Amino acid sequence: MSDRFLSAADFVLNWSRKYSLWPLFFGLSCCFVEEATAFTPRYDMARFGAEVLRPSPRQADLLIVSGTVFKKIAPVVLRLYEQMAEPKWVISMGSCSNCGGMYDVYSVVQGIDQILPVDVYIPGCPPRPEAVLQGLTLLQKKIAAEERPARSVLHLPGGSQGSTRPVLVDGATKSRDPRGPGMEGTVIRGTANTPPAFTGSRSDLMWTPPARRIESSEREKELARVLSERFGDAVREEPFTSDMPTFHVETNRLKDVLGFLKKEASPRFLRLDDLTAVDESARRDRSAYPDWTMVYHLLSFEPAGRVRLKTGLHGRQPALPSITDIWPSANWYEREVYDLFGIRFEGHPNLRRIMMPHDWEGHPLRKDYPGRATQMAPYTLGDARVHQPPDGGIFTKDPGGDRLVLNIGPSHVSTHGLLRYVVSLDGEEISDLELEIGYHHRGVEKIGERQTWHQFIPYCARVDYLAGAANDLPYVMAVETLADIKVPERAQVIRVLLSELFRLSNHLVWFATYAHDVGAMTPNFYTFTEREMILDIVELITGGRLHPSWFRLGGVAADLPEGWKEAVDALVRIFPGRLREYESLIRKNPIFKARTQGVGRISREDAVDWGVSGPNLRACGLEWDLRRKFPYSGYENFEFEVPTAVEGDCYARYLVRVEEMRQSLRIIEQAAANMPSGRHVTDDYRYVIPDRRDTLKNIESLIHHFVNVTRGPRIPKGEAYVSCEIPRGEQGYYVVGDGLGYAYRMRIRGPGFANVQVMPLLARGESIADLIAIIGSVDYILPDIDR
């Protein structure tokens, strides 16, 4: 056969293939949001030769690996790739997929090219939608210039098609060091146990102010008195705290005290807000602490109040009683502590790993466990083939029964991220449901123990990559609470403005995807228009889109730019009419109502008991919003209503979120109209990054800038917990400081962890078709659940 004919055939085949690429519907993390945005009207990826995302790997020939590659999900990624038909191509999208990015941590593969061949790399964190389009055109050029498919198609020797590049080996055929080539001989400064070393540093000799101290209210004093009378020396009140009443409890009386606080105390602390542990083995004042500290945060609704309980444990394999019989929500929290710390809970109904793979060795949040992936053996293609997810049968409570067991996920169009549902079916009816999470676990709490207080801010927005700057607020407020940093009024209102813009953005994405979940595709093509308008405002103000990383300790990174108010006013003018138009598409639609009304019900009492928060809680009839109950950042100065519904079903959750958008717009309008004058960051530069103009005027500001940027500010020794009302619910940060430039313990309480744990309660007795409607109505996001 002549070369001329083969060359012509190569041209025709390459032209056909490069302009008819079929990407797989597959996403790992933040980058997938921008990948999906590339298919919306502003960008319209179809113009560039890539059509609708395909739900099955057997229908796709392009795998865009968008986001962080986790060791737990890596075998699934490999399986999806191997199920794709030849020829097939791979685009690695974003810094995390390319090389691990900012997640050099125990749970993350340092690049997808360690298990798959990669044709095109798209840099960025995350790349913009325009970068996705450029990556696609680069792949098309590669297909046209490098591939000779005719011989393969005609079963002749020679030729090439699809991905042909080799899989790389970390440390052998690619750089092992996360800082890039040429850095292998330079030791990384600092670990979770050892702070960064600066030769000749006298920082330990420097005086720093003590942590903030609060006065107990009369109600809190009464609670302390009652606990002392009831439990005697088994309960000891901590004399000084920065945020809430704190009590140390003897382990053998812990369960009694917790039960009393929930069922008999006045007020009753009905919700277990969080449960976590602290490994005390690396404390500088080691003799003052036990080996471990268990920490319980409780919440009362009437009146609004919080309390913290702590108990000390000793030994390498400590144990204490489970409290799952007091709060069912403790189930996952205790499993997480067992998984990451190795602390056992006696009487727990199912104490097994929850975040890490089932065959993982060790407990990552122990201080002696390596924090960086580059401190561990390189992850290889062989590892991905060996460490497979467990069979769905092990999750069922009746493995020998006659129920049909159905796996949904961990990669599925309707799971809204990397989450695995194991469904037991009696015909079409769901008889039981188990979830396997942890596929998106990227060790952010461990990272918080090595990054300085300022360096950790970029990680916050990535905990919920659709809530943007709203994620930063509970973190910076927790540190500000501990260090008693006063935030200027202008900075507080700017924070509110950005947080509410991201609430609108989040709910617009939810509106579109939820409508799609139940069969209405049209909203997808409309709501992203206003979302892009909101992100344009965010970009105008902060310079970023999804992850501005713009909040700072003591304020925000910069003052508002020229033109910000005009852009916000334009949004305020057009948004109400657009929202009415979108709502008219589905609110009274008989199909939508049939799919959502009476489906996925949960009572108010169950929602409280399981720790549900945000719109999902308010849809059960409880008017609970932290912006009202624990006002922060000046929210007490804004007029807005707290939307509620009483049915507790999918339709009620829809109604609450739609009305929340209207209320957020009211707050945005007030913030823009009444923006106070003044500073955008505090002038107390002991802990914050000084304004550049001040560093040019006086040496004191310049010194603070140098110290706080290099080794980080020395935040006082102590602890603080702050929770904020982000779009999906209550997100809290519990920061523990040991007087150094970074956190000793960084704990994140994500709303999705509790909201998703209740999923079996919502789904039992419903049909399998209704499960998709229930999943979408809860509005969770995986990095918030898995952290």
Curated annotation (Swiss-Prot):
GO terms for cellular component: plasma membrane. Residues 154-205 are annotated as: Disordered. It is found in: Cell inner membrane. Residues 1-149 are annotated as: NADH dehydrogenase I subunit B. Disulfide bonds: none annotated. Residues 191-202 have a biased composition (Polar residues). Residues 407-787 are annotated as: NADH dehydrogenase I subunit D. It comes from the Bacteria. Keywords: Cell inner membrane, Cell membrane, Membrane, Multifunctional enzyme, NAD, Quinone, Translocase, Transport, Ubiquinone. In the N-terminal section; belongs to the complex I 20 kDa subunit family. NCBIfam families: nuoB_fam, NuoC_fam, NuoD, PRK06075.1, PRK06411.1, PRK13292.1. NDH-1 is composed of about 13 different subunits. Subunits NuoBCD, E, F, and G constitute the peripheral sector of the complex. This is NADH-quinone oxidoreductase subunit B/C/D. It comes from Syntrophobacter fumaroxidans (strain DSM 10017 / MPOB). The gene is nuoBCD.
